[in-house]
């Protein structure tokens, strides 16, 4: 096990208040409590599983996410034209996932290297920035996909004009702008720090110096870019399910794709997004307000659970390609057609090379004067 002190920075306001009460009332207990709370910080115990669990998850996400999203982008660019509105959102979702998985090799090395960051402060900031851009970009694009499907199912005629590709492009540009602006403070809060053992940490949140303001920022982004989209998605899906029950859509492609969409997106939120945001908030609160000797074991458990949810939060990059395959507009059919075409082309090339090789062999025999063939 490795001890990594969070900090020895006092919780200034609370400590000063307690110290003032102790001085005013002459109460040594309160004064000593103030002294403890102003100086004591739990030593964070990093157990061995964190050095193996996270890199194992990230390796899995990198392999599956890289292959799945590469195929998805290839399909959208070369085989899905003309795009529908929902294809625009899915392409942007695949792009966000692909950019994130490209950053994982550095993170994998970081954890195999016992969390000693060797890539510099700028790369650390960029790593954390891209993670959060992917996280909240994915949530917002899933919200757009859900709203798009809701309009198509519940108001199929009224929504014809609103579901055009041009409008989806405008919305996608707006989503990217919102996410980049909202996440840009991460470039300030994140960064590297030197531990007592001279190794370098890459903060996944921030140092204790900026922890309280980061907590406020984190809560604002959680409410605006997670809670509100989740409520909108649940509302859309409730109305979609209601429409599927009351409308005559038995065995229609729209019904099937809508059901797949509901199941996959809710699974992603239940497994990846909800646990991560709950445990991230608890971990920040523990670092801020639960710094007493009797709370250190609790803080260690919170931190360990938070690390588990960090791995789960990255799994959406593996699951999203399943969404394109099952719930996308004609994605599965065109992927099958593209693979068959590529297979036929490969067979034709192989046959052509075989014929060329045979002709070359016959030519060599003739040149050598061998007429036995």
Swiss-Prot record:
Name the CDD domains for this protein: 7tmA_P2Y1
Compartments, record wording:
Cell membrane
* Gene Ontology CC entries for this record: apical plasma membrane; basolateral plasma membrane; cell body; cilium; dendrite; glutamatergic synapse; plasma membrane; postsynaptic density
The UniProt entry's GO biological process terms, in alphabetical order, are: adenylate cyclase-inhibiting G protein-coupled receptor signaling pathway; blood vessel diameter maintenance; cellular response to purine-containing compound; eating behavior; establishment of localization in cell; G protein-coupled adenosine receptor signaling pathway; G protein-coupled purinergic nucleotide receptor signaling pathway; G protein-coupled receptor signaling pathway
What are this entry's molecular-function GO terms?
Answer: A1 adenosine receptor binding; ADP binding; ATP binding; G protein-coupled ADP receptor activity; G protein-coupled ATP receptor activity; G protein-coupled purinergic nucleotide receptor activity; protein heterodimerization activity; scaffold protein binding
Membrane topology category: Multi-pass membrane protein
Residue ranges annotated as Cytoplasmic topological domain: 75-87, 148-166, 238-260, 326-373
- Where is the secretion signal located? none
Superkingdom to which the source organism belongs: Eukaryota
Cystines in this chain = 42-296, 124-202
Record field: transmembrane: 52-74, 88-109, 126-147, 167-188, 215-237, 261-284, 304-325
According to the record, glycans are attached at 11, 27, 113, 197
**Extracellular-facing ranges:** 1-51, 110-125, 189-214, 285-303
Free-text tissue specificity from the UniProt record: Expressed in muscle, heart, liver, kidney, lung, brain, spleen, but not in testis.
Name the protein family. Belongs to the G-protein coupled receptor 1 family.
What this chain does, per the entry, is described as: Receptor for extracellular adenine nucleotides such as ADP. In platelets, binding to ADP leads to mobilization of intracellular calcium ions via activation of phospholipase C, a change in platelet shape, and ultimately platelet aggregation.
Q: What is this protein called?
A: P2Y purinoceptor 1
Coding gene? P2ry1
């Amino acid at each position: 096990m490795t001890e990594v002190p969070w900090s020895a920075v006092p919780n200034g306001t609370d400590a000063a208040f307690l110290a003032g009460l102790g001085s005013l009332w002459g109460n040594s207990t309160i004064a000593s409590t103030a002294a403890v709370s102003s100086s004591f910080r739990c030593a964070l115990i990093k157990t061995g599983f964190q050095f193996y669990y996270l890199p194992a998850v990230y390796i899995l996400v990198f392999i599956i996410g890289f292959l799945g999203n590469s195929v998805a982008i290839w399909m959208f660019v070369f085989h899905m034209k003309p795009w529908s509105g929902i294809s625009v959102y899915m392409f942007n979702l695949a792009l966000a996932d692909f950019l994130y998985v490209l950053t994982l090799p550095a993170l994998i090395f970081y954890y195999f290297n016992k969390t000693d960051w060797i890539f510099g402060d700028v790369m650390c900031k960029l790593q954390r920035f891209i993670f959060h851009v992917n996280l909240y970009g994915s949530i917002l694009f899933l919200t757009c996909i859900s709203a798009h499907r809701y309009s198509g199912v519940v108001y199929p005629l009224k929504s014809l004009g609103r579901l055009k590709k041009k409008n989806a492009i405008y919305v996608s540009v707006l989503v990217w702008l919102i996410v980049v602006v909202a996440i840009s403070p991460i470039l300030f809060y994140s960064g590297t720090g030197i531990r007592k053992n001279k190794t370098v940490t890459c903060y996944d949140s921030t140092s204790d110096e900026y922890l309280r303001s980061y907590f406020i920022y984190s809560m604002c982004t959680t409410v605006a870019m997670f809670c509100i989209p989740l409520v909108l998605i649940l509302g859309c899906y409730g109305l979609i399910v209601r429409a599927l029950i009351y409308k005559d859509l038995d065995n229609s492609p729209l019904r099937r794709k809508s059901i797949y969409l509901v199941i996959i997106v809710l699974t992603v939120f239940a497994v990846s997004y909800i646990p991560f945001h709950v445990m991230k908030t608890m971990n920040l609160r523990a670092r801020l307000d639960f710094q007493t000797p009797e709370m250190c074991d609790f803080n260690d458990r919170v931190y360990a659970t938070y690390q588990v949810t960090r791995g789960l939060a990255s799994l959406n990059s593996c699951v999203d390609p399943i969404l394109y395959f099952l719930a996308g507009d004609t994605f599965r059919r065109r992927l099958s057609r593209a693979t068959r075409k590529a297979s036929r082309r490969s067979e034709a090339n192989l046959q052509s090379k075989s014929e060329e090789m045979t002709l070359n062999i016959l030519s060599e025999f003739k040149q050598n004067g061998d007429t036995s063939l």
